[in-house]
Regions:
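Membrane-interface soluble catalytic domains
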Residues: 1-275
Length: 275
């Protein structure tokens, strides 16, 4: 993430002069803009073609525009929602490596989330309680290399929604009345691995919806009582982007979405603007 202090941090990086007015929090969370450039030497990347014009043509266009009548305010009954262009753009590799895992304690009737940042840049995570949207969401700043944990008291059901940078998304739905599957998400290069465990006394079935980015799936997995299964999802064809929703009995749901960072340059969200 970049903000107004990112320009100052870029100048610090370039000239070695430290700006004392940039807070420690902004240094942890906001980048210094160096990732927006490619400093590889030699750099043989072709420069993008820009539309050319002349000073005379630009002045002529400005003069014609100044003679136009003001654009009338459109009627509220005729206004349309702007359309988002559905086009992926080149995207630099990002420094984020975020992990969020859940653990249900039936005896204490709590749901705990473990938040971990194994990347090189701090990040802010927002956690919304879908069953109590009137409550202020909990917000956490995770420094690079740090981890923390927090818990929610659950009466019967829970529904938490975690949001982070660059489309990072985790959803946790379930109930306390019965033991339900548990999910652990790990990654290796261009693959995402889901490990599903079943702490219950009976076999459990988990359905995984089709991934809209790669069109893989759907799948149905059977987990024996006290056992676990693993499912691997290649993400290279989608530039690292993934969106997987898992369902089981009793309203159990987990959703994991975002972009898998490998240190390589990729593309922006290819499904941006689509419902």
């Amino acid at each position: 993430m970049f903000d107004h202090t990112s320009v100052l941090q870029f100048l610090e990086k370039r000239f070695g002069v430290r700006e004392p007015n940039v807070s420690a929090w902004r240094r942890a969370v906001c980048g210094d803009l160096t990732s927006a450039f490619n400093f590889v030497d030699p750099n043989h990347e072709p420069l993008p073609t820009l539309q050319t014009t002349t000073r005379q043509a630009a002045d002529s266009l400005r003069q014609r525009q100044e003679k136009l009548l003001p654009v009338p305010v459109p009627s509220t009954s005729k206004q349309l929602v702007p359309q988002q262009k559905r086009l992926a753009r080149p995207s630099r590799a990002l420094p984020y490596r975020l992990h969020v895992d859940s653990q249900v304690d039936h005896k204490a009737r709590t749901l705990s989330l473990s938040l971990q940042n194994t990347g090189t840049q701090g990040a802010v995570l927002h956690v919304y309680d879908g069953l109590h949207l009137g409550d202020i969401p909990r917000r956490y700043t995770l420094e690079a290399g740090k981890a923390l944990q927090d818990s929610w008291t659950v009466v019967e059901r829970y529904q938490l929604w975690v949001l982070g940078p660059n489309g990072f998304h985790r959803s946790f739905h379930g109930q306390m009345q019965q033991r339900q599957p548990e999910l652990l998400v790990t990654s290796s290069q261009h693959q995402l691995q889901l490990t599903l465990s079943n702490p219950g006394g009976q076999a459990a079935t988990v359905s995984i919806d089709r991934c809209p980015y790669t069109q893989q799936g759907p799948w149905t997995l059977s987990i024996p009582a006290g056992g676990e299964v693993r499912q691997v999802f290649p993400c290279e064809s989608s530039g690292g982007w993934y969106d997987l929703t898992l369902h089981s009995d009793g309203g159990w749901l987990r959703r994991v979405a975002g972009r898998l960072e490998t240190g390589e340059h990729s593309i922006s969200d290819p499904l941006m603007g689509r419902p």
